[in-house]
Amino acid sequence: MLTVAILAAGKGTRMASSLPKVLHKLSGKTLLQRVIDSCNELKPDKIFIIVGHKSKEVKDSVFKNNNIHFIVQKPQKGTGHAVQVLSQKVKKHDGKLIVLNGDVPLIKGETLKKLIHYHDSQKADVSLITTKKKNPHGYGRVFAKDNLIEMIIEEKDCNNVQKSNLLINAGIYCFNWKSLSKIINTIKSNNKQNEIYLTDAIYLLKKSYSFEILDNGELQGINNRVQLSKCEETIQNLIKEKHMLGGVTFINPASCTVSEESIIGKDVIIDANTHIRGNSKISNNCKIGPNTFIKDTIINENCEIINSTIFNSVLMDFVNIGPYSHIRPNCEISSYSRIGNFVEIKNSQLDKEVKVNHLSYIGDSTVGKHTNIGAGTITANFDGKKKHPTFIGENSSIGANTVLIAPINLGDSVTTGAGSVITKDSQNNSLAIARTKQVNIENWKKN
């Protein structure tokens, strides 16, 4: 039986945030969820998440499944106390127990598997991951001989000589559950912080081993925003390298971000300052950016987007967007359509070869194929209480500076006169003009 305990009860005061530390995000996922995802690669029988500070928020953030359980640690008196609380709540202490913090988001499932294998090979009571750091500031120091641990001292309790030791405790343990259960509740808070340290279990167990790995960055804990930023950079580099090896060009990778969930096809060019978030999918031969933000959007082949923002929409093949377009949620823009500068579209469906080239707002609208929307066109869809739809048929031409007062239905091949305010439906093949007759006053002088 394999049990995992993730320690997520702390406040994270050094983050200087009202949000619990484990709920800060890296590339769209919370620190805690990243640790859970890595632990799930072990296929554990149960995962216990030890919560405390703002426990409801932490619980609500987790993607639930049947093997995840929550235990409240109150008050929070250290890592050893957290496992004491766990031990009192869990009736069976069989097999192995993995204990790790919820703020090590880069830890790999493969590394945890290696820890378990090492633990089994040594028939250990406890094995913990260690590594040598050039700058070990903030970490407890491990003192071992032939991988047998002699002592672990938290940095706060180290003297200057002990601080010179570079072998650190990564805070990731594999325990023999039965061995741990016999001694866990005997640990006391005999330290400057008046906390119960899990590391004190090392002295009470007979076979305590150091599993040393190279410092490749995955053991980085997060205690402040600087460390959060460094981890974000690490994750982003891995994501972008994967896409580049798969056939994507980044003009300036350092200025771009891509979510892990996003899918990008071959021969896509991502220009500088472009950010692709959420569950976005970009198909082959697209050009994206510069200065573009895309979230939860499907972009089909041969599209070009420049200096624009797109949320939760679908673009079919050969669509051109931008510069300075804003495509809001629930839009579908069909093939060979063109959305130009300073155009906002929301909750609308545009059929093939529709052109909205500049300075327009199209909301809650359906536009037929081959229709041209002139500059300055506005669909006035809100009456102060409700949103109303606009329907424009095929092969229509909406004149510049037209206002369409919804609800309204324009048929196929309808033309509106420039500067019109259209309030009534228009039938197929009609011309709609709604503006006052021009009056010229001769010999006019300003006062």
UniProtKB/Swiss-Prot annotation:
GO BP of this protein: cell morphogenesis; cell wall organization; lipid A biosynthetic process; peptidoglycan biosynthetic process; regulation of cell shape; UDP-N-acetylglucosamine biosynthetic process
Record-linked Pfam families: Hexapep, Hexapep_2, NTP_transf_3
GO MF annotation, one: structural constituent of carboxysome shell
Entry GO CC: carboxysome; cytoplasm; membrane
Record EC number: 2.7.7.23, 2.3.1.157
Keywords in alphabetical order: Acyltransferase, Cell shape, Cell wall biogenesis/degradation, Cytoplasm, Magnesium, Metal-binding, Multifunctional enzyme, Nucleotidyltransferase, Peptidoglycan synthesis, Repeat, Transferase
Subunit structure: Homotrimer.
Function field: Catalyzes the last two sequential reactions in the de novo biosynthetic pathway for UDP-N-acetylglucosamine (UDP-GlcNAc). The C-terminal domain catalyzes the transfer of acetyl group from acetyl coenzyme A to glucosamine-1-phosphate (GlcN-1-P) to produce N-acetylglucosamine-1-phosphate (GlcNAc-1-P), which is converted into UDP-GlcNAc by the transfer of uridine 5-monophosphate (from uridine 5-triphosphate), a reaction catalyzed by the N-terminal domain.
Protein name, UniProt field: Bifunctional protein GlmU
Organism name: Prochlorococcus marinus (strain MIT 9515)
Gene from which the chain derives: glmU
